[in-house]
Amino acid sequence: MKWSEISIHTKEEAVEAVSHILHEAGASGVAIEDPAELTKEREQQYGEIYALNPDEYPAEGVLIKAYFPQTDSLHETIAGVKSSIDVLPSYDIEIGTGNITVNEVNEEDWATAWKKYYHPVQISDTFTIVPTWEEYTPSSPEEKIIELDPGMAFGTGTHPTTTMCIRALEKTVQQGDTIIDVGTGSGVLSIAAAKLGASSVQAYDLDPVAVESAEMNVRLNKTDDIVSVGQNSLLEGIEGPVDLIVANLLAEIILLFPEDAARVVKSGGLFITSGIIAAKEKVISEALEKAGFTIEEVLRMEDWVAIIARNA
């Protein structure tokens, strides 16, 4: 089968939005080439885990590559993707050039080549995220491994927002906590919560592909006795109370449900949010406070923030 590689040149703050647009358009795989990755490991306290080839990354901005089967409707799909991306600036998301290029590739070329982007990465004092095909030996008995298979279009959990959410969970999860993960994606945050001692984790996503991916990864990590995965839109119809809600979503989506979060989280419970570019920190904090939360801590990494808030 012939496939088309759609490459979009954009900015880091648009990565999650553009990736979501590509998934919704039916991409069979997405790879992100961010030059910030070339220096990230040297800058973090956990040391350089692996070496990256600078020739595979753009000089500036971020290159997002998605793979679509070649069909008669491909041109319409690309036009739809472009239209959706062009709307992002109206949500204060800078897209940079937004240039789109198309290349033809053979199935055997892309079906395995994307694996070069994924390697074991220690993202905190507790967790190392390991792709399923990589061999990895923990460096200490305390180190916890999360195995992920990103083959269903979700990444390996090393984006700054995911990293900050996991570190926030490390700070806050108590033995026996009940937790809801809103917009679970690959399920990585739910798996981390289970491995940190939660007694029950409800993981929800509106995207059926995400639900399938999360279910697979939950089983892979043997946390399916704690984590249940289901399809749902944010917190619609969800009853509480629970000890903690975590949501790694775009700021515009988080703004849709602070009141629901306050309803579902027990009094004194926590709401952890990320997916927030630094420029949106104030508006998210104000929305949380208006809903009755108190901001306890803000984590920062690169141009992103995560907020830990406590319910009244």
From Swiss-Prot:
GO MF annotation terms: protein-lysine N-methyltransferase activity
Pfam families (UniProt xref): PrmA
UniProt key word Transferase: yes
Biological process per Gene Ontology, one example term: methylation
Chemical reaction(s) catalysed: L-lysyl-[protein] + 3 S-adenosyl-L-methionine = N(6),N(6),N(6)-trimethyl-L-lysyl-[protein] + 3 S-adenosyl-L-homocysteine + 3 H(+)
Stated role: Methylates ribosomal protein L11.
Similarity comment: family membership: Belongs to the methyltransferase superfamily. PrmA family.
Protein name: Ribosomal protein L11 methyltransferase
